Design a protein with these regions (language model features):
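Binuclear metal-ion centers of metallo-dependent hydrolases, dominated by the metallo-beta-lactamase
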Residues: 127-153, 224-273
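Conserved beta-strand hairpin/beta-sheet module of binuclear metal-dependent hydrolase folds
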Residues: 27-76, 168-188
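Pre-active-site segment of Zn-dependent metallo-hydrolases
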Residues: 47-91, 98-102, 165, 191-205
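Active-site neighborhood of phospho(di)ester-bond hydrolases with catalytic His/Asp-centered motifs
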Residues: 51-54, 82-94, 114-117, 185-189, ...
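Bacterial N-terminal signal peptides that target proteins for export
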Residues: 1-9
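Active-site HxH/HxHxD metal-binding segment of metal-dependent hydrolases
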Residues: 74-145
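Active-site-proximal loop/helix segments of hydrolase catalytic cores
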Residues: 160-227
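Bacterial Sec-dependent signal peptides at the C-terminal "C-region" and cleavage site
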Residues: 12-26
Length: 273
């Protein structure tokens, strides 16, 4: 494979040791705001996407989105105004709250909502929803993908079944998001096995940032290197009692990986002038 040119990045707020840079010279900075558990707000230039950020429950020791973030998320106010797409990976309560999604759709006439079909079915089972034409149920075929364009944002839904060892069955979808030249992968709670990842050939996607559960790094880092091959790793899905030991454990397996632990913390990835 030919070698592409590389640039040098600075990560403000968190130092990344040994991280590989984003390589698309035209891409503006990527900003990530941690919402809770696997929830993030992604911003690249004027494009904004939220993934797994609308949930209210503390489930199995995972933190809910705090009120100072959840309120603006539900009402499309403050920094949460102007989000063009909200994505949910699966229906578990530490990733999805029907009440919160319905509130956002009712208060925001622009946003599109993308989720596995069983999540959309749950949403609609609770009664009529605002702007149903902006709700997209996604069911990729086994090992397959579905491509969606939302206001010029290219989103690919990947069939990545839920990790069967951690919580009850759920239809889990991973997402590839292309924001102004930056490619981001969010896997939800996908099963970290080669069987699930190999069909997608993700190294060919040249992923700039992969957002994965912490156990992907502490228990399955070889899979991430071989079947995702991201330039930068962001680890989340932490428990309320997580300590700095978790950061050390992640750093030992993947030097330079960032662990998101405090809701509201923000990362900004800049290029040197």
């Amino acid at each position: 494979m030919p070698t592409r040119p590389r640039s040098v990045l600075l990560l403000c707020a968190v130092a990344l040791v040994g991280a590989r840079p984003l390589e698309r010279q035209s891409a503006p900075p990527l900003e990530i705001t941690y919402l809770a558990n696997m929830g993030v707000l992604l911003e690249v230039g004027n494009r904004r996407v939220v993934i797994d950020g609308l949930h209210r429950a503390e489930l199995d020791g995972t933190p809910p989105v705090p009120p100072d973030l959840l309120g603006p998320l539900e009402t499309a106010t403050g920094r949460m105004r102007g989000v063009e797409a909200i994505l949910t990976t699966h229906r578990h309560l530490d990733h999805f709250a029907s009440r919160s999604v319905r509130a956002r759709l009712a208060s925001d006439p622009i946003v599109h909502y993308l989720a596995p079909s069983e999540v959309v079915d749950t949403l609609r089972a609770h009664g009529p929803v605002s702007f149903p034409n902006r709700i997209h149920g996604l069911t990729p075929r086994p090992g397959g993908r579905l491509d969606v364009d939302v206001a010029g944002i290219r989103i690919t839904a990947l069939d990545l079944p839920h990790n069967p060892t951690r919580t009850p069955r759920a239809q889990n979808v991973g997402y590839l998001i292309r924001l102004n030249g930056v490619t981001i992968l969010h896997v939800g709670d996908a099963d970290p096995t080669a069987e699930r990842y190999a069909p997608h050939n993700l190294p060919a996607e040249h992923i700039d940032v992969a957002i994965v559960p912490t156990w992907y790094i502490t228990e399955s880092s070889a899979l991430v290197r071989q079947h995702i091959a991201p330039r930068k790793v962001i680890a989340s899905h932490v428990w309320l009692d997580a300590t700095e030991k978790l950061r050390r454990d992640v750093d030992r397996e993947w030097p330079g990986a960032v662990v998101l632990m405090r809701p509201g913390e923000r990362l900004r990835i800049d290029r040197e002038p």
